[in-house]
Amino acid sequence: KWIMVGRLDVNTSGLLIFSNNGDLVQKLSHPSSAIKRYYLCRVFGNPKKSQIKKLLNGVEIDGNKSCFDEIIPMKKKTNAKNNWFKVSLHSGKNREVRKLWETESLQVSRLIRIGFGPIELPEDLKKGQYRCLEKNAVERVIKLTGMEG
């Protein structure tokens, strides 16, 4: 039986990971695993440096402190209606990326998960396609959890 690691909400696309090892899925999915997730975000508007700083230092969401580990602008356009950012965070709470931006009154208009720990979404992999991980990639993922291979 294949089990999905975490999930993507209805308005998010990108990398999905499946495994037939329930213990591994549990360890990878749980927020306490602190495995970095990487996303491309299209944000409506032009965030100020002060807003970016707040999102990196931490804001309160649903009674808990949350922050991005990094926010990297992609092709900065000062007068653009939308701007793309590569972001990473180490927890996987429900809609966390969107909620973080929303604390600064910024709306995410597109969200794509491009990485989960050492696994990256291949650029040549089209929507709806899949690819099995190489053995060394599986071993790196297992090592992240502290499980034996």
Feature-to-residue mapping (PLM):
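Basic, flexible Lys/Arg- and Gly-enriched helix-loop patches that mediate nucleic-acid binding at interfaces
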Residues: 1-149
